[in-house]
């Protein structure tokens, strides 16, 4: 009987993942989903959503849902390329070509680090370099020595 709740919880996780994987229908990274599970094009492709979904799909893969490993890899690749500012470092809040892609925030960078470090712990290709980039950017651009915070 103790296995019952665990099985029920994993069934719920599987339903959530089935819904969440629809975010991969976006052309860039992962898209914002409507409550119906379709991409909501009112929102630009963002670092935040891409990082959150990368984290989620990596956790899913770690839980044994191996079919989500490729989505975790997709997220790491998008964060490392499309959302990365090759000229000035760091990560754009939204993908270039969508709104003001020049904006950057510590919040977005923290989510990139969360996604990257989780992916790194699961051996996702490209995650090591993404961790290094996110961590160095957080400390070089957002760390406030005078306050001891980001």
Predicted regions and their residues:
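Glycan-recognition and catalytic cores of secretory/periplasmic carbohydrate-active enzymes
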Residues: 1-150
